[in-house]
Curated annotation (Swiss-Prot):
One of its GO terms (cellular component) is cytoplasm. Involved in the regulation of the intracellular balance of NAD and NADP, and is a key enzyme in the biosynthesis of NADP. Catalyzes specifically the phosphorylation on 2'-hydroxyl of the adenosine moiety of NAD to yield NADP. Pfam families: NAD_kinase (PF01513), NAD_kinase_C (PF20143). InterPro entries: ATP-NAD_kinase_N (IPR017438), ATP-NAD_kinase_PpnK-typ_C (IPR017437), NAD/diacylglycerol_kinase_sf (IPR016064), NADK (IPR002504). It comes from Hamiltonella defensa subsp. Acyrthosiphon pisum (strain 5AT). Disulfide bonds: none annotated. GO terms for biological process: NAD metabolic process; NADP biosynthetic process. It is found in: Cytoplasm. Belongs to the NAD kinase family. This is NAD kinase. Keywords: ATP-binding, Cytoplasm, Kinase, NAD, NADP, Nucleotide-binding, Transferase. NAD(+) binds at residues 73-74, 159-160, 170, 187, 189, 200-205, 259. PANTHER family: NAD KINASE.
Length: 304
């Protein structure tokens, strides 16, 4: 039997009246079931709840056993990057579009969530990616004002990191190094570095393969490469990826889950690697990933 829950956090951005109605219903239902309920401050304000315990996303992560995210996959991604730093399980109620990460139907949420709260659920540990944008110079004089040290920029992603130019439809040149060994150079519109979770997101649109969520692998998918030999590449999740730029790389960016964007300066390189943190995503007991793909991607039924 899985661990049961005592303290439950409710979060998600109050985008519309339907999402807020789900937040409102969940809060009052969980309180009637005698759970300790913590509501994200934005939600509590939007619902005008009184005598309610509110907290920031980080505080919910540290104080709750379970976080319920109401919204779409974008809401889940934004919350998950922070919640993954804490020992908390996460489940989603789909108030978005596709809903790969948000399992529960808002029309049947009480019934489905009741079983989960009894300990009837499946747990998946989804790994994250981290990136550093740092100087590519091997030696920098820290006291030399003519050669100042540029602070490292960092980012985290559940789905993917995307290297891209600021200018739309603009080809860039870069090298890819894997575990300190040269792998390939490329002229393209960019590169997608995706987790198995992200293999059904932007990577899929660029022709990348679908990876099962618990596979320990990282996916590299070229974006409109200027060569027929460029193909998606799947590597071990423990690999370190380094993106290097021979020429002045004006206005290059690294996008993390399309929500955080880091700028790449001249004489900088990008390092991407598996994070030490995991997202503890839980599902109803009857969750089957292949069935999820059938439903969400509209795959046809058996031909014979």
């Amino acid at each position: 039997m899985n661990k049961k829950f005592n303290s439950i956090g409710i979060l998600g951005r109050p985008r519309d009246s339907e999402a807020l109605a789900t937040h409102h219903m969940l809060y009052h239902w969980l309180k009637s079931e005698n759970y300790t309920v913590i509501v994200e401050r934005e939600i509590a304000d939007a619902l005008s709840l009184r005598d309610v315990t509110t907290a920031s996303l980080k505080d919910i992560g540290s104080q709750s056993d379970l976080a319920i995210v109401v919204g779409g996959d974008g809401n889940m991604l934004g919350a998950a990057r922070i919640l993954a730093q804490y020992d908390i399980k996460v489940i989603g109620v789909n108030r978005g579009n596709l809903g790969f990460l948000t399992d529960l139907s808002p029309d049947n949420v009480q019934k489905e969530l009741s079983e989960v709260l009894k300990g009837e659920y499946l747990t998946e540990r989804r790994f994250l990616l981290e990136t550093q944008v740092k100087s590519s110079l091997t030696l920098i004089e820290p006291n030399n004002s003519s050669c100042p040290r540029t602070p490292n920029l960092t980012g985290t992603a559940i789905n993917e990191m995307v290297l891209h130019p600021e200018k739309v439809a603009h080809m860039i040149e870069f090298e890819v190094w894997i575990d300190d060994l040269f792998a390939f150079s490329q002229r393209s519109d960019g590169l997608i570095i995706a987790t198995p979770t992200g293999s059904t997101a932007y990577s899929l649109s660029a022709g990348g393969p679908i990876l099962t969520p618990t596979l320990e692998a990282i996916l590299l998918v070229p974006m409109f490469p200027h060569t027929l030999s460029a193909r998606p590449l799947v590597i071990n999740s423990n690999s370190k990826i380094c993106l290097k730029f021979k020429n002045s790389n004006h206005n290059l960016k690294i996008s993390c889950d399309s929500q955080t964007v880091l700028s790449i300066g001249n004489d900088q390189e990008v390092v991407i690697y598996k994070s030490a943190h995991h997202l503890n995503l839980i599902h109803p007991k009857d969750y089957i990933y292949i069935n999820r793909l059938n439903t969400k991607l509209g795959w046809s039924k058996k031909l014979f």
